[in-house]
Amino acid sequence: ISGKNDGVIKPRIEKDKAAQELRSREKAEVFTPSWVCNVQNNLVDDAWFGISRRRFNTEKQDGWKTNYYPISFAETKGRTWKDYVRATRMEVSCGEAPYLTTRYDTVTGKYIPVRCRVGLLDRKLRVILENVSNGEEWIEWALIAVQNIYGYDWQGDNVLLARENILYSVIESFHDAFDMMLDKE
């Protein structure tokens, strides 16, 4: 939304406190800090991998330390990185979709570098990068990853922000990996 309607829809962190409180009271809208999303997403991965081991990061109080080594699929009983990317994930009441992609902390507004993100899509994009050999193949698998994550929200502005965050996360991840921008197609 641009022109005279610029700023009508904006992330929660850019709204004044009164507007945030009103949305919380009237719509039961709350926003989860990224470190909490990470803890819960780690539990999702523990269930998928079948073992409790922090593959993507190590949890710290109110944060995490990214593990930069490649994600191993050796202990997944025959499942591969492709199965991980194809695994369906859904965030109900997604708001700005911090469980799917953590481009910024929804509470503080702090930008999170691509390689340190903890969303479910972010993890899939990382796994793709670790297992493909070129940008064309990355795009093919990134599309599959996006097709297998879902966000639902009652508030239309949140749905728009969630979609925007998913799109930008893919664009930023591609740029970070290949030091070039995606084609418009």
Region spans (language model):
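SAM-dependent methyltransferase catalytic region
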Residues: I1-E185
